[in-house]
């Protein structure tokens, strides 16, 4: 096993050009020696580059796993914008070629299984480096470090940590949501149980929308519900051992009125009829699309409140609230720019080999947040105590 990553070659392979591919790709065209965009066909890759204003700045390629593997060299970086089930085989090809790997998705079991081999080969595996997951991790690490410095790591305390993120229409519609890609993923996420800490107790919401609560951000009311499994992040975020969670939840943010507007959808989800839900996804895509005339909005609020007793309290919150433009959606900006930032740090050899989830350390998180702010991803920090 090596503690040193394979030296970067300077070549970046960006695989896939979906709706989350934005100005992050342009950043890599500025910083990497060579960029190759892999798409379904070479023509589609050329069209995607032209649409992004990057014609001639990256080499178009027709993607198959075999075609990519044939061009991989040691130290190349593969950026996967493909669905998560594709990441395991793609990482396997990277490990074999001793090429680095980066994505914005949660760590899948297939990626986790290959992580030891990647580290042994000197391959960096950067994951969870988009918006959510990604920027949310940076915010959490920064808040925890600040609170620990203020309260003390050895001080007994209780805390509440909430992390809510949502992509919503900038101008609310009656449905309180618009679909920028296939709704099946949104619907199936609502069918998955959510596990989190509430009132100091581990809680599971079998139907996450039933746990929806009002959530106020700077005077604006949203609706928030838990999503996926929050509990593993207790260990991942490394809060002091003497601090006990009152509430710890990572979840989804929606516009006020969403719960009521979606009542007919929830009734369909309750039936657990896969065929009907697939049909419903197609219906919703047609009824509530995000068109070229629409603008999206991304809101990410991460809050930490720590109570050490005797009036000793600390509270901090990061808020990101961005609206898309005609040139780039807010979601594309917030996913592609942190991912590209992570890739630049693979290129400059500042990331170690093995599995990483975004920046992971408080020091690296602070550095990345400074760089993201300089790169146009705006956010605000508020601290009390």
Predicted regions, residues:
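C-terminal catalytic/substrate-binding lobe primarily of soluble NAD(P)-dependent oxidoreductases
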Residues: 3-4, 9, 146-385
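Conserved N-terminal Rossmann-fold NAD(P)-binding element of oxidoreductases
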Residues: 12-17
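Hydrophobic/small residue at the entry helix of a nucleotide-binding pocket
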Residues: 19-23
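NAD(P)-binding Rossmann-fold cofactor-contacting core
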Residues: 32-49
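Rossmann-fold cofactor-recognition segment
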Residues: 53-66
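Beta-loop-alpha module in the N-terminal Rossmann-like domain of NAD(P)-dependent dehydrogenases
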Residues: 67, 77-93, 108-109
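ADP-ribose/adenylate-binding Rossmann-like module
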Residues: 93-111
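Rossmann-fold NAD(P)-binding glycine/threonine-rich loop
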Residues: 105-127
